[in-house]
From Swiss-Prot:
GO terms for cellular component: cytosol; nucleoid; protein-DNA complex. Its main location: cytoplasm. Pfam families: Histone_HNS, Histone_HNS_N. This is DNA-binding protein H-NS homolog. It comes from Haemophilus influenzae (strain ATCC 51907 / DSM 11121 / KW20 / Rd). Residues 106-134 are annotated as: Disordered. GO terms for molecular function: bent DNA binding; DNA-binding transcription repressor activity; minor groove of adenine-thymine-rich DNA binding; protein dimerization activity; structural constituent of chromatin; transcription cis-regulatory region binding. InterPro entries: H-NS-like_N, H-NS_C_dom, H-NS_C_dom_sf, Histone_HNS, Histone_HNS_N.
Length: 134
């Protein structure tokens, strides 16, 4: 898509592309491009009109609220806020295995994820996982 945009916005690229087309093909492409641009303009105009109408409605509601003596806080009390269900974090799993790493530090492992290198080396040498249980 970037290549197409670059080609359409660069005059030299357009000239090179048009050289390879017949006049009829170039005019056909021009008509289609103009149609697409007109559709884009109409779409943009609709969006601007909808936003303008929305702002007018909001201004009308604000004026009506002021006329009736209603405050935004009162509306907030009535409508409240949307409650977003936040998924609670899972509690960390307790450690099941203890080992001493290459630096001589005492470490623990929950049993999930990749097996720590010292435990894996011991398992490769014939030890059992139960040898490391806490």
């Amino acid at each position: 898509m970037n290549e197409l945009v670059r080609g359409l916005t660069n005059l030299r690229s357009l000239r090179a592309a048009v050289r390879e087309l017949t006049l009829e093909q170039a005019e056909n492409a021009l008509e289609k491009l103009q149609t697409a641009i007109e559709e884009k303009r109409a779409n943009e105009a609709e969006l601007i009109k909808a936003e303008t109408e929305r702002k007018e409605r909001l201004a009308k509601y604000k004026e009506l609220m002021e006329k009736e003596g209603i405050t935004p806080e009162e509306l907030h009390e009535i409508f409240g806020t949307k409650t977003v269900s936040i998924r609670a974090k899972r509690a960390p799993r307790p450690a099941k295995y203890a080992f001493i790493d290459e630096n001589g530090e005492h470490k623990t492992w929950t049993g999930q994820g990749r097996t720590p290198r010292p435990i894996q080396n011991a398992l490769n040498k014939g030890k059992s996982l139960s040898d490391f249980e806490i």
